[in-house]
Amino acid sequence: MLKVLVVEDEEMIRKGIVLAVDWAALGCVVVGEAANGLQALEAVERYAPSLIITDLKMPVMDGLEMLRQLRERGNNAFVIILTAYDSFAYAQAALRLGAVDFLLKPFHDGELEQAVTRLKQRMDRAGQGGEKGPAPLPLPELKKGD
């Protein structure tokens, strides 16, 4: 069972993600929510999620900085990015930091579920089955400003 943390500054969207998705059918359980990257880092310490679903543009700390800090701390949780940014540069930066998927908002019915299903299939092919948590991801060398 994947433990999910939902990170989104807009409360209606965050609650919609938590309530509208049939997480149990996906083999997941939502263990926490956060309204910005800083709250997310604290929630990661508290809940040890194996999957983080996050927005990019948030106050206090954005999703890319949160992801960068997670990786610097050795946290290899899977990350799915949800954002209104349609910039290839943002997608590329998130993927370089180990994000496993990138969905543009507004996303359509079933898109998030499909992203989670793709992740679970990748995990099954890798022999993880979703029960052991994420395997370490190979990470590129990052320079300031990346």
Annotate the PLM regions.
Residues 36-39, 62-65, 83:
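Acidic catalytic/metal-coordinating carboxylates
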Residues 58:
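Receiver (REC) domain active-site loop signature in two-component systems and cognate sites
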